[in-house]
């Protein structure tokens, strides 16, 4: 595995979360070293990492604009949003759960970036 993919997993992958509430976000953001300073928004993708990797090819992905890839199937995700105030710890987050498609950038068949600001169209 390459460093960019390992970084992607550290920032955005949690296979089986212990919860999806604000406490989950506060704990995970600190555990994954995203609280110095407080990162504004971060999304954790849950499930199987092979399914996420499959977005990089045609098994579970399709081309999207600007060289990105969009998943064909939805993923369970938890998005953590900083509540505002000081960017210095302690950081307080609000959790938002969703089941949605994801948009990522891939390199050599591995996810390296999650497009945080992608909002899926309403069905």
UniProtKB/Swiss-Prot annotation:
Transmembrane segments: none
PROSITE patterns: RNASE_PANCREATIC
Activity control, per UniProt: Divalent metal ions, such as Cu2+ and Zn2+, may inhibit the ribonucleolytic activity.
Locations listed in the record: Cytoplasmic vesicle, Secretory vesicle lumen; Secreted; Nucleus, Nucleolus
Sample GO molecular function, one term: metal ion binding
Active site: 12, 113
Protein name: Angiogenin-2
Gene: ANG2
